[in-house]
């Protein structure tokens, strides 16, 4: 039986060698730090180059969430772990239910702690993940793959599209090297890595930057913030309780003790506390007002009696 010939991947931007780091093994510690710092500047440039696609993705995600859909990140290895990381931060930051933003990682929870890179080669597993999560046309699926070719991710996106689901593709190679028929193609071109092929470096950094923008941007559109304050923060520990009190103090004329009392009266809900204070409404009436305006504090306040 003839030996299977592996597909050549050397043409991919993320697999190429970086001419700036050819003497990597000869650098001093300070020179290493300087080189990393220099190369990491390219992540900012890459985000700027994808600004219109990132904005389009925010619109798709926020529209879907506003209509009762969910956001799913799906990936393998570092890319998948970054999706999980961004997803699990949404409930404490924006008080969202855990099912609203979810990260799907090839290999499941165990792959968070132990590398399971071989699982990324199975496209059928990606498709099965879409079925297992009962993804529908109301949802949005964001496929993340630094090199742009991961079968697990493409299998998931193909299955999602077949269900009428909106799809977004994030890769760190040009579309000509790894095409994908997604609704939005986000290409974060940071160039070859300092350590050739190690996409946990610049590619990982720029991917996390992009996910920060997508999730936070969508939550801003959904009214989860007021100004630049996280008024939907879930008060689940002393640090977050202190933050909630400081938000109330900064946005009202209350002292710290009064702000703490208001927070208690609102059931530890900053957004509700602010509307109660500004409008004079009871907690029940203020909550009803927020509900009428989809939880948007600014709109609820503008319409308050």
Curated annotation (Swiss-Prot):
Pfam families: GKRP-like_C, GKRP_SIS_N
Enzyme Commission designation: 4.2.1.126
An individual GO BP term: N-acetylmuramic acid catabolic process
Record function comment: Specifically catalyzes the cleavage of the D-lactyl ether substituent of MurNAc 6-phosphate, producing GlcNAc 6-phosphate and D-lactate.
Family, similarity comment: Belongs to the GCKR-like family. MurNAc-6-P etherase subfamily.
Pathway entry: Amino-sugar metabolism; N-acetylmuramate degradation
Catalytic residues as annotated in Swiss-Prot or TrEMBL: 89, 120
Superkingdom of this protein's organism: Bacteria
The protein's name in its UniProt record: N-acetylmuramic acid 6-phosphate etherase
Entry-linked InterPro entries: Etherase_MurQ (IPR005488), Glucokinase_regulatory_CS (IPR005486), MURQ/GCKR (IPR040190), SIS_dom (IPR001347), SIS_dom_sf (IPR046348)
Catalytic reaction equation(s): N-acetyl-D-muramate 6-phosphate + H2O = N-acetyl-D-glucosamine 6-phosphate + (R)-lactate
Keywords (A to Z) from UniProt: Carbohydrate metabolism, Lyase
Enzyme class, spelled out: lyase
Any further remark recorded for this protein: A lyase-type mechanism (elimination/hydration) is suggested for the cleavage of the lactyl ether bond of MurNAc 6-phosphate, with the formation of an alpha,beta-unsaturated aldehyde intermediate with (E)-stereochemistry, followed by the syn addition of water to give product.
Organism whose genome encodes this protein: Synechocystis sp. (strain ATCC 27184 / PCC 6803 / Kazusa)
Subunit structure: Homodimer.
């Amino acid at each position: 039986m003839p030996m299977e010939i592996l597909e050549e991947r050397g043409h991919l931007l993320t697999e190429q060698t970086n001419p700036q780091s050819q003497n990597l093994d000869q650098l001093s510690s300070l020179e290493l730090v300087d080189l990393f710092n220099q190369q990491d500047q390219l992540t900012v440039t890459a985000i700027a180059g994808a600004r219109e696609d990132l904005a389009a993705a925010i619109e798709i995600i926020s529209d879907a969430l506003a209509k009762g859909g969910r956001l799913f990140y799906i990936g393998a290895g570092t890319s998948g772990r970054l999706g999980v990381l961004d997803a699990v931060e949404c409930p404490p930051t924006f008080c969202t239910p855990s099912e609203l933003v979810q990260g799907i990682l090839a290999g499941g929870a165990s792959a968070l702690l132990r590398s399971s890179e071989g699982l990324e080669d199975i496209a059928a597993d990606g498709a099965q993940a879409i079925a297992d999560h009962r993804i529908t046309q109301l949802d949005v699926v964001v496929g993340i793959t630094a090199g742009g070719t991961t079968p697990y991710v493409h299998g998931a996106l193909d299955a999602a599209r077949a269900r009428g689901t909106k799809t977004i593709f994030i890769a760190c190679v040009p579309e000509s090297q790894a095409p994908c028929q997604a609704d939005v193609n986000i290409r974060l071109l940071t160039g070859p890595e300092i350590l050739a092929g190690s996409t946990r470096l610049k590619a990982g950094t720029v991917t996390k930057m992009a996910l920060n923008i997508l999730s936070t941007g969508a939550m801003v559109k959904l009214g989860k913030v007021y100004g630049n304050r996280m008024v939907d923060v879930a008060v689940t520990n002393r640090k977050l309780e202190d933050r909630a009190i400081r938000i109330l103090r900064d946005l009202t004329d209350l002292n710290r003790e009064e702000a703490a009392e208001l927070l208690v009266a609102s059931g530890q809900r900053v957004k509700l506390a602010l509307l109660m204070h500004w409008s004079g409404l009871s907690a029940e009436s203020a909550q009803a007002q927020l509900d009428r305006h989809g939880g948007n504090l600014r709109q609820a306040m503008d319409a308050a009696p």
